Amino acid sequence: MTENYTEGMFYYKVEVLRIVDGDTVDVRIDLGFNVWHKCRVRLVGINAPESRTRDLEEKKRGLAAKQWLIDRLEFHDVEMQSHGTGKYGRVLGELFVEGVNINQLMVEKGHATEYDGGKR
């Protein structure tokens, strides 16, 4: 994951519309000049437990990760650093609140594990 500016990556202000789960959010990206783009963003570099599963223990951890993310993003100004698109066509991004890398913080707080895009 990236802590500082990385060449070739773009930063955007985003409006979080919905937290899908602990590693996926729906946002509106401010492209500037009053142009917005709505999309689903997969948080790059992390994997959170599934919140929609029959495994009750994983579901419990997944719902906790989702709630933790809601608590960190709701009512805050959020920025996103784009990392292109992933293998399923979703935008990949890192989220920041007041300069804090939320993706990284999720791993540090135990709500997600590091993930490089391979098999889980």
Residue spans of the language-model regions?
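Small beta-barrel nucleic-acid-binding modules, primarily SNase/OB-fold domains
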Residues: 1-120
